[in-house]
Amino acid sequence: MLERISIGVAALVTAVLATFASAQAFDDAKYPDWKGAWDRIVPTWIQPGDKPAPLTAEYQAIYDASLAAQARGEPGNAPSTFCIPQGMPMMMTAFDPMEFVVTPDTTYLLISHVNDSYRRIYTDGRDWPRDFIPTYTGYSIGKWADPDNDGRYHTLEIETRELKTPRVFDITGLPMHKDGQTVVKERIYLDKADRNFLYDEITTIDHALTRPWTVTKKYRRLPSSRPNWISQVCAEANSYVRIHGEAYFLSADGYLMPMKKDQAPPDLRYFNPTRK
């Protein structure tokens, strides 16, 4: 018994010492100053200057149908309407404040969004896992780059795979392919002229696109060095229900309401009273 305890204590001490050594080796001055909270300062959809997504004919038709549905007041392909997490790459196009936590082996990206979204970006030189289960944020591996050759890191280059489907790019419902093979590459860096602005070059490689597609998102550092984060849970305000592919609105008194003109009622056969 004592031998087991000694082994356990030794393992714990080893882990603590390894963490301490890693922290000691972390040269904060070598990394860019991304402290504070960052907020989007342009629209949450494709911003001016970006070229339209080069969608295939099949997925352009899906996108057009989503835009038409939203024009009628329906949710279209927007996943957050039904409490589905935004995930990547949509979470990087949202308007919610975000915060970076940089460590030697991992950069954490915390986003003050519904369900408190976050990302882990591994920068420890690891390879891709063999049996990772796809998630909304995917699996991200990054590396720091020094494009100015001044001995300091300026850019975080990231590749994200293993994204759970269905997936859209932004709130307009721009669709990604359902095969789950989406790859998102990013380059995040500060504005050289004004360190209070941050850019994220997002390149999406996807079979719904005829070629890789790059857009650039811009963020502004918020004035407060101690921002207040608001925790939200989507279920608290979820008023939409999807049944057999059809969306319905849930009224304040708990009744299903149609989302469009002449919409057929949902099939509630299992709720019908049993006839004797």
Regions found by a protein language model. Give the residues of each.
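Hydrophobic small-molecule pocket/channel-lining residues, especially in calycin-type beta-barrels
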Residues: L2-S6, T19-K276
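Hydrophobic helical h-region of N-terminal Sec-dependent signal peptides
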Residues: A10-F20
